[in-house]
Amino acid sequence: MNPTSIVLIVIATVAVCLIIMQIYYIYENYDNIKEFNSTHSTLEYSKTINVFSLDRRIYDPNDHIYDVKQKWRCVNYKNNYVSVSVFGFKSNKDKNIKMFTTINDCINYTFSKSTHSDIYNPCILDDGFQNQDCIFLKSVI
């Protein structure tokens, strides 16, 4: 065997290995590929997706917080879901607690990068620790 044939055999072997790896990755992610295609099939011929999709692998407000009590989470409160942390509840501008009917709505609101909401902490008000909202907040933290 001359050096040229050895180089060609090595290149062919590497190419076959890469093809096998690609087939394996497609096999592993086939369900995700089908889900993505079904979600965006109506936009097949458009230039951009133009659909709000939230990828929490890229942005998570809890990524840079190391104290567990400060991390935002969604919990069940009065048959609805609310975003809580040690700082308080996520709220509307008029200091009403923002409530969601489903946990997915709460998660999408809490972990959306575009959401800049107010925070309402009922424990720093005049009635303070006697407030039902404050008692609940302390119980989940």
From Swiss-Prot:
Regions crossing the membrane: 1-21
UniProtKB keywords: Disulfide bond, Fusion of virus membrane with host membrane, Late protein, Membrane, Signal-anchor, Transmembrane, Transmembrane helix, Viral envelope protein, Viral penetration into host cytoplasm, Virion, Virus entry into host cell
Domain of life: Viruses
Compartments it resides in: Virion membrane
InterPro entries: Poxvirus_A28
Bilayer disposition of the protein: Single-pass type II membrane protein
Residue ranges, Virion surface side: 22-141
Any one cellular-component term (Gene Ontology): viral envelope
Transmembrane helix listed as a keyword: yes
GO biological process: membrane fusion involved in viral entry into host cell; symbiont entry into host cell
Main location per the UniProt record: virion
Modification(s) after translation: Contains two intramolecular disulfide bonds. They are created by the viral disulfide bond formation pathway, a poxvirus-specific pathway that operates on the cytoplasmic side of the MV membranes.
Cited function: Envelope protein required for virus entry into host cell and for cell-cell fusion (syncytium formation).
Similarity comment text for this entry: Belongs to the poxviridae A28 protein family.
Protein name, entry field: Envelope protein A28 homolog
Source organism per UniProt: Yaba monkey tumor virus (strain VR587) (YMTV)
Lineage, top ranks: Viruses, Varidnaviria, Bamfordvirae, Nucleocytoviricota, Pokkesviricetes
